[in-house]
């Protein structure tokens, strides 16, 4: 049985399809919260610390309230930065009417990565159990 599934990278003469992977990324971190500030942002701090520990750089960091337009505009601004390869958001992913991060980000994605949400919920289940059903997560590629 062949592992060939019809993609160009199946040709042994083709470069590895992970050739674009990089060890060091420039990452923008956005916290979405109406009750926190950048000075008191444990989730954002934890994300930034984990990224830096993994060898990535934080290109910018910001905090915006739970507001669709502000979340979307800030993510768009981060995506447009030349020094930013990825944007990580935290907050605003619950099920209350104020939680709009997922709705604000998804229209910006050219390709969604549903496996991220699946993995996020699986790992969260280990920590919070069945409360995980009230969490939402999304990931994707902007700019195709």
Residue ranges and their predicted role:
Residues 1-144:
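Non-catalytic beta/alpha edge segments that cap or flank active sites
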């Amino acid at each position: 049985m062949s592992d060939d599934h019809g993609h160009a990278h199946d040709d042994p003469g083709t470069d590895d399809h992970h050739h674009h992977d990089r060890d060091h990324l420039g990452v923008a971190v956005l916290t979405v919260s109406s009750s926190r500030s950048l000075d008191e942002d444990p989730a954002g701090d934890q994300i930034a610390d984990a990224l830096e520990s993994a060898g990535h750089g934080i290109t910018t960091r910001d905090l915006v309230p739970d507001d669709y337009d502000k979340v979307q505009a800030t993510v768009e601004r981060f995506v447009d930065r030349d020094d930013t390869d990825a944007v990580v958001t935290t907050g605003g992913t619950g099920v209350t009417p104020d939680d709009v991060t997922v709705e604000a980000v998804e229209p910006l994605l050219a390709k969604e990565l549903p496996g991220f949400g699946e993995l996020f919920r699986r790992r969260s289940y280990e920590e919070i159990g069945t409360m995980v059903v009230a969490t939402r997560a999304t990931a994707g590629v902007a700019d195709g």
